[in-house]
Amino acid sequence: MDVEKKLFLKALKEKFEEDPKEKYTKFYIFGGWRQSARKREFVEFAQKLIEKRGGIPFYNPDIGVPLGQRKLMTYKISGTDAFVEGDDLHFCNNAAIQQLVDDIKRTVIVGMDTAHAVLEKRLGVEVTPETINEYMETINHALPGGAVVQEHMVEVHPGLVWDCYAKIFTGNDELADEIDKRFLIDINKEFPEEQAEQIKKYIGNRTYQVSRVPTIVVRCCDGGTVSRWSAMQIGMSFITAYKLCAGEAAIADFSYAAKHADVIQMGMILPARRARGPNEPGGVPFGIFADIIQTSRVSDDPAQVTLEVIGAAATFYDQVWLGSYMSGGVGFTQYASATYTDDILDDFVYYGMDYVEKKYGLCGVKPSMEVVKDIATEVTLYGLEQYDEYPALLEDHFGGSQRAGVTAAAAGCSVAFATGNSNAGINGWYLSQILHKEYHSRLGFYGYDLQDQCGAANSLSIRSDEGLLHECRGPNYPNYAMNVGHQPEYAGIAQAPHAARGDAFCLNPIIKVAFADDNLIFDFKWPRKCIAKGALREFEPAGERDLIIPAA
């Protein structure tokens, strides 16, 4: 690739204010932690709060290893022009990352056909577009916490739950035309024509409700609460809209359908050692996460679609799931942000896609080990050569496992672009890790590559303990639950073949449609831009409590 075309050079020059190829730099001249405006702000706030804390010591950057011996880097959010401080990418400091997680956790999808069948066949009540519209108006009152069946019921302040609503979608164009547009996710409107036809073919005449439970609920409770909150209000709304008796036996069928039989969760329940209910990050399969991200509706660039999935997944899986649920603390942000900052992964992925297009064409070759070896080797060596040639790039990705993850992600995605096959893609990742280890004798921290050493052996069989198609694997897949710097890239490798083929969805068309919704708080079409807004403090989240606390 021509030097002037390398995507990461602009960021490196801005960050370090020196030639990215310079082999020597300076230390101890930057003013320590004071070079960072954000850390100066942290210290100022901490000093004010010590008295409020009764004198208990608080944030003090002079404790521990001296900060700021080197340049405290800013980070360019890849695919944008925004440069931000690293601290503002920690999920606690970034309202957009928090909302990304909340919007997934607070979503549940419920099939409406069972409930409609109970109404018509068991109770003799006619279901029409008019009654569906009346029900949807009722559920949009009840779901945020409004009472419909009994009086003397306490209700929730609308100002706290303004983000809560329900919508409906169907693959039946005639029914969709009759639904009040305020409630409809219109497949024909939201998707390009070819994608819309593909999705409607899969969904058919079935009808689904999407419930967005209030953000404040998943802040106080957990993802497992969401289907219950939704089901309770669905039951009350059916009783009201169809004028049913609250105590009759058929109501149990509504409850069962809304809580269990027709429920589609975003994430599966986790085992006891991880102890999380449904709709928590650790239970979201990679293919489902790829479908949650909506870039494929608005871009036909396979690399861009894939990179947006990886960027969002880095915050979701590495920063929040592994970095907080499973670990806690501050260190995981640096691992995760390597995949969505400074256009480094973008450069490697576009290099790989260009190589594929020239030699094979997108989806132009059947998967084979020879193809995996060729593409993964080419892209891996390109990435490693950049780290050799540009010391500033090495400083940017200062951890070996950052470099391994980024290089292997580009290799795996490139193989997937060529073959249209996620299994080939994940083997491209595994091979890249092995090549990288041959090149440098090690990758990152001890055990980083543990899962990669055994990956190829169990990716070519479908077994209950080690198998699964790649799109169906997730953070709790046995060998994938171990280490940071893998799961976001795996989500990208799940997306890459479908992006290359121009598929409307990756794993589940119902999930894809559910998030094709402009009323969501987080922008799932352009996650990296949204994360940048969060870092720049320009993002307005939901779930705030200003209405019920003293004015500042």
Curated annotation (Swiss-Prot):
<feature type="binding site" description="in chain A">
    <location>
        <position position="228"/>
    </location>
    <ligand>
        <name>coenzyme B</name>
    </ligand>
</feature>
<comment type="pathway">
    <text>One-carbon metabolism; methyl-coenzyme M reduction; methane from methyl-coenzyme M: step 1/1.</text>
</comment>
<dbReference type="InterPro" id="IPR008924">
    <property type="entry name" value="Me_CoM_Rdtase_asu/bsu_C"/>
</dbReference>
<keyword id="KW-0533">Nickel</keyword>
<dbReference type="InterPro" id="IPR009024">
    <property type="entry name" value="Me_CoM_Rdtase_Fd-like_fold"/>
</dbReference>
<protein>
    <recommendedName>
        <fullName>Methyl-coenzyme M reductase II subunit alpha</fullName>
        <ecNumber>2.8.4.1</ecNumber>
    </recommendedName>
</protein>
<comment type="function">
    <text>Component of the methyl-coenzyme M reductase (MCR) I that catalyzes the reductive cleavage of methyl-coenzyme M (CoM-S-CH3 or 2-(methylthio)ethanesulfonate) using coenzyme B (CoB or 7-mercaptoheptanoylthreonine phosphate) as reductant which results in the production of methane and the mixed heterodisulfide of CoB and CoM (CoM-S-S-CoB). This is the final step in methanogenesis.</text>
</comment>
<feature type="binding site" description="in chain B">
    <location>
        <position position="273"/>
    </location>
    <ligand>
        <name>coenzyme B</name>
    </ligand>
</feature>
<dbReference type="InterPro" id="IPR015811">
    <property type="entry name" value="Me_CoM_Rdtase_asu_N_sub1"/>
</dbReference>
<dbReference type="GO" id="GO:0050524">
    <property type="term" value="F:coenzyme-B sulfoethylthiotransferase activity"/>
</dbReference>
<comment type="subunit">
    <text>MCR is a hexamer of two alpha, two beta, and two gamma chains, forming a dimer of heterotrimers.</text>
</comment>
<feature type="binding site" description="in chain A">
    <location>
        <begin position="259"/>
        <end position="260"/>
    </location>
    <ligand>
        <name>coenzyme B</name>
    </ligand>
</feature>
<keyword id="KW-0484">Methanogenesis</keyword>
<dbReference type="InterPro" id="IPR015823">
    <property type="entry name" value="Me_CoM_Rdtase_asu_N_sub2"/>
</dbReference>
<dbReference type="Pfam" id="PF02249">
    <property type="entry name" value="MCR_alpha"/>
</dbReference>
<dbReference type="InterPro" id="IPR003183">
    <property type="entry name" value="Me_CoM_Rdtase_asu_N"/>
</dbReference>
<feature type="binding site">
    <location>
        <position position="335"/>
    </location>
    <ligand>
        <name>coenzyme M</name>
    </ligand>
</feature>
<dbReference type="GO" id="GO:0015948">
    <property type="term" value="P:methanogenesis"/>
</dbReference>
<dbReference type="InterPro" id="IPR009047">
    <property type="entry name" value="Me_CoM_Rdtase_asu_C"/>
</dbReference>
<feature type="binding site" description="axial binding residue">
    <location>
        <position position="150"/>
    </location>
    <ligand>
        <name>coenzyme F430</name>
    </ligand>
</feature>
<dbReference type="InterPro" id="IPR016212">
    <property type="entry name" value="Me_CoM_Rdtase_asu"/>
</dbReference>
<keyword id="KW-0488">Methylation</keyword>
<dbReference type="GO" id="GO:0046872">
    <property type="term" value="F:metal ion binding"/>
</dbReference>
<dbReference type="Pfam" id="PF02745">
    <property type="entry name" value="MCR_alpha_N"/>
</dbReference>
<comment type="similarity">
    <text>Belongs to the methyl-coenzyme M reductase alpha subunit family.</text>
</comment>
<keyword id="KW-0479">Metal-binding</keyword>
<feature type="binding site">
    <location>
        <position position="446"/>
    </location>
    <ligand>
        <name>coenzyme M</name>
    </ligand>
</feature>
<keyword id="KW-0808">Transferase</keyword>
